[in-house]
C-alpha cells in the first residue's frame, strides 16, 4: 500500500519561493497548508482539490489545528466521483469524531446518490434508497408508504402521475413518517418535500443536449431533504417529521403529457401545461398538498427547480424563498452556523398572479411579460400550501450539482444544504 502523504496546518505564510499567494507548500515531510485567518475552511477545501489533482489518493491529516470542520472542509474538496481516496483522520474528541463520521455517512450518501446514473436510479430505486437510509439511522421509529403508477391517478396525485406516465418506469410517491414519540397522535413538527425527477429530458419541450446532460441530478432536492432528515436524526431529532418524495422520469413517449393539457389537483386547482420542462413544480404540488394536510409547524420543500435561480446565484448558493420573514431568518442563521451558502430571493404576493392561463386557474410557467422565473415558480408552489404566508420555506437547489470541476469542488454533487436543514430541524 502507498504510504500516506502527511498534510499539516500552519498559520505561518509559505516560503517566498512558493509565491506570494501560495496556500500550500511541499517538503520532505509532506504538504503544509498555510492558513491566513481570512477563510481557512475555504482555503483547506481549495488546497484539498489541488492535492487530489496531483494524483495523491492517500493522505494523513497530521499535527495540530485539525477539528471536525477543518477535516470536513478537506474532504469536501478532496472527494471526487472517480477513483478511491483514503484519509487517515487526526485524533479528535468523541463529539467531534462523531460529528465528522455522521457527515461522512450522510452527506456522502447524498453526493453519491445524486451522482448515480439515471439508468441505475429510477423513481422506485430513489424511494427505496431513501427508505433504507432513514431506516438505518432511525430503526423502528420510521413507517412509510410507497404509492406508484396507476394507484397515484386513482388516489388523485395527478401532477406526479401526469409527469411520470411517459416513462416505462412508474412514478412513485414516498410518504415517510419519522415519529420518535411512539404516539400515533403526536403532532407533526415539520414536513419535508423533495423533487425527485430521476431524469429530465424536458418532455415535449425538449432540452438541448447542453442542458440535458446533467439531468440525472434533477432529483437533488429529494436526496437533500432525505439526507437532512437522516442527519437531524443522528443529531438527536426528537420531534415528528414527515418526508414526501415526488419521484418520476420526465420523458417523451406516446403516453407522455403534452402542451395544453390541464391537470386538476386534489385542492381544486386547475393548471394548464404550457411547458413540459417546468415539470418539477407539477410533481411538488402533490407533495405540498399532502404536507399541508399534516398541519405542521413548518414545511420545507427542496428542488432543482429553475435555471433562473442559477442565473441569479450561479452554483455557489442555494436560493431561498419565503413569505415568512422570521422562519427565513432562522434558516439563514442555521446556514451561517453550518457554513453553507444560502441567499434569499424575492417572493411577493404579485408573483402568485404572474402565471396567467386562458383555460385554467394557473399556467405552469410564466410568460415573457413576467421574467422572474425563480420567483414565479415559488409563487406557483404557494398555491398548493394551505397557509403559505407562515411556516413555509422553498429552496431552489442551485448549489446542488456542478457540471465541471472548480477551485473548491470536483464535478458532480456537493451535498450542500443537508446540514442547514438538519440544523433548523434540531434548533
Curated annotation (Swiss-Prot):
The GO annotation for biological process reads: proteolysis
Gene that specifies this protein: pepB
Q: Which residues bind Mn(2+) 2?
A: 195, 200, 218, 279
Q: Name one GO cellular component term.
A: cytoplasm
Q: Has UniProt tagged this entry with the keyword Lyase?
A: no
* Name of the protein in question: Peptidase B
Q: State which Enzyme Commission number(s) the record gives.
A: 3.4.11.23
Native organism is: Shigella flexneri
Quaternary data: Homohexamer.
Q: Name one Pfam family in it.
A: DUF3663
State where Mn(2+) 1 binds.
200, 277, 279
Q: What does this protein do?
A: Probably plays an important role in intracellular peptide degradation.
One GO MF term on file is:
manganese ion binding
Under catalytic activity, the entry for this protein gives: Release of an N-terminal amino acid, Xaa, from a peptide or arylamide. Xaa is preferably Glu or Asp but may be other amino acids, including Leu, Met, His, Cys and Gln
Instruction: Tell me the cofactors it needs.
Output: Mn(2+)
**InterPro entries, per this entry?**
Leucine_aapep/pepB, M17_PepB-like_N, Pept_M17_PepB, Peptidase_M17_C
Where does the UniProt annotation locate this protein?
Cytoplasm
Active site, UniProt feature: 207, 281
What the record notes about the co-factor is: Binds 2 manganese ions per subunit.
Q: What's in the keyword line of the UniProt record?
A: Aminopeptidase, Cytoplasm, Hydrolase, Manganese, Metal-binding, Protease
Cited SUPFAM superfamilies? Zn-dependent exopeptidases (SSF53187)
Question: Which protein family is it in?
Answer: Belongs to the peptidase M17 family.
NCBIfam families tied to this protein: PRK05015.1 (NF003450)
Amino acid at each position: 500500500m502507498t504510504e500516506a502523504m502527511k498534510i499539516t496546518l500552519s498559520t505561518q505564510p509559505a516560503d517566498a519561493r512558493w509565491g506570494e499567494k501560495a496556500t500550500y507548500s511541499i517538503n520532505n515531510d509532506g504538504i503544509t497548508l498555510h492558513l491566513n485567518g481570512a477563510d481557512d475552511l475555504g482555503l483547506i477545501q481549495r488546497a484539498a482539490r489541488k492535492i487530489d489533482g496531483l494524483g495523491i489518493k492517500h493522505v494523513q491529516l497530521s499535527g495540530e489545528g485539525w477539528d471536525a470542520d477543518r477535516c470536513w472542509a478537506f474532504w469536501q474538496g478532496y472527494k471526487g466521483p472517480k477513483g478511491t481516496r483514503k484519509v487517515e483522520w487526526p485524533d479528535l474528541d468523541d463529539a467531534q469524531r462523531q460529528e465528522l463520521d455522521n457527515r461522512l455517512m450522510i452527506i456522502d450518501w447524498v453526493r453519491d446518490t445524486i451522482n448515480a446514473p439515471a439508468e441505475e436510479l429510477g423513481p422506485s430505486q430513489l424511494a427505496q434508497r431513501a427508505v433504507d437510509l432513514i431506516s438505518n439511522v432511525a430503526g423502528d421509529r420510521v413507517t412509510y408508504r410507497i404509492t406508484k403508477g396507476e394507484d397515484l391517478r386513482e388516489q388523485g396525485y395527478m401532477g406526479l402521475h401526469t409527469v411520470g406516465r411517459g416513462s416505462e418506469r412508474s412514478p412513485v410517491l414516498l410518504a415517510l413518517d419519522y415519529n420518535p414519540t411512539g404516539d400515533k397522535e403526536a403532532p407533526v413538527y415539520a414536513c419535508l418535500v423533495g423533487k425527485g425527477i430521476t431524469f429530465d429530458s424536458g418532455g415535449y419541450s425538449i432540452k438541448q443536449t447542453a442542458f440535458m446532460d446533467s439531468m440525472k441530478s434533477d432529483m437533488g432536492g429529494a436526496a437533500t431533504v432525505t439526507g437532512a432528515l437522516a442527519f437531524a436524526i443522528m443529531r438527536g431529532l426528537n420531534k415528528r417529521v414527515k418526508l414526501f418524495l415526488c419521484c418520476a422520469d420526465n420523458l417523451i413517449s406516446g403516453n407522455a403529457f403534452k402542451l395544453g393539457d390541464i391537470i386538476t389537483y386534489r385542492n381544486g386547482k386547475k393548471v394548464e401545461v404550457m411547458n413540459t420542462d417546468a415539470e418539477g413544480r407539477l410533481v411538488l404540488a402533490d407533495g405540498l398538498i399532502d404536507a399541508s394536510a399534516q398541519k405542521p409547524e413548518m414545511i420545507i420543500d427542496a428542488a432543482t427547480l429553475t435555471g433562473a435561480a442559477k442565473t441569479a446565484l450561479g452554483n455557489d448558493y442555494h436560493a431561498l424563498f419565503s413569505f415568512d420573514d422570521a422562519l427565513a431568518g432562522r434558516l439563514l442563521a442555521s446556514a451561517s452556523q453550518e457554513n453553507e451558502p444560502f441567499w434569499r430571493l424575492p417572493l411577493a404576493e404579485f408573483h402568485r398572479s404572474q402565471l396567467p392561463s386562458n383555460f385554467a386557474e394557473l399556467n405552469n410557467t410564466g410568460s415573457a411579460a413576467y421574467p422572474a422565473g425563480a420567483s414565479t415558480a415559488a409563487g406557483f408552489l404557494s398555491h398548493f400550501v394551505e397557509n403559505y404566508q407562515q411556516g413555509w420555506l422553498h429552496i431552489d437547489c442551485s448549489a446542488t450539482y456542478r457540471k465541471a470541476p472548480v477551485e473548491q469542488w470536483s464535478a458532480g454533487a456537493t451535498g450542500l444544504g443537508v446540514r442547514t436543514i438538519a440544523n433548523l430541524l434540531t434548533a
